[in-house]
Amino acid sequence: MISDIEFALSEHNFQFAYKDLQKINLYIKRILLLNTRFNLISNSNSNFNSILNLHVIDSLLGLSTVKEINPSEVLDVGSGAGFPGIILAIFDTSRKYYLLERSKKKSTFLKMIKLELDLENVKILEYEIEKEKKKYEFITIRAFRSMNEYALILKNLLKGGGLIMAYKGKFDRINLEVNQIKNLFSKIEVKSLNSKLRVDRNLVLLYR
């Protein structure tokens, strides 16, 4: 399994150490083992290669943007099984990642993974987003919901000049969603991702 992870990371030109491969391997195995108990991901994608490509690699496609902006802290909203927050934290150990997850089941899983993978740069926040008072430079979200469902509440959690990085799919759908929220932000940028996954993947950057 580690060879599959190494191939996938190399195919996308990601830099990694062997310990990163070990952590990803253990992480995926834990998801497979505990998925039914914690309701982490769709059963249709609950095999090793699907998790690796559709979740791990997809999450890593945003890492270069995080490093380019270089915030001191990142808030990952609705972390679920830990995508993208856990993955970004594994490969970006010098930065603090806050993973916000309201589900007790999923946050329990995240706390287990944090300890097992020894992720000292991760903190799990188990509550509704409306209860968060801290302001952040950088917020990530990887959700199937339309951006107009969360744009305003996330904007209010941004520091001045901060941004939201939303993982999104097809460009046509993005255009429709952007038109609904364009007046909320000073600038909106869409970045096409260089994915080998044969699916349309884009990042939408929403600047306060």
From Swiss-Prot:
Keyword rRNA processing listed? The answer is yes
Quick one: which residues bind S-adenosyl-L-methionine?
G78, F83, E101, R102, S103, I129, E130, R142
Q: Which residues form a coiled coil?
A: none
Query: InterPro entries from the entry?
Result: rRNA_ssu_MeTfrase_G, SAM-dependent_MTases_sf
The alphabetized UniProt keywords are: Cytoplasm, Methyltransferase, rRNA processing, S-adenosyl-L-methionine, Transferase
Mind naming one GO cellular-component term on file for this protein? cytosol
> MF terms per GO, please?
rRNA (guanine-N7-)-methyltransferase activity
Q: Which domain of life is it from?
A: Bacteria
Is S-adenosyl-L-methionine a UniProt keyword of this protein?
yes
To which protein family does this belong?
Belongs to the methyltransferase superfamily. RNA methyltransferase RsmG family.
In Swiss-Prot or TrEMBL terms, this protein is called Ribosomal RNA small subunit methyltransferase G
Species whose genome carries this gene: Borreliella burgdorferi (strain ZS7) (Borrelia burgdorferi)
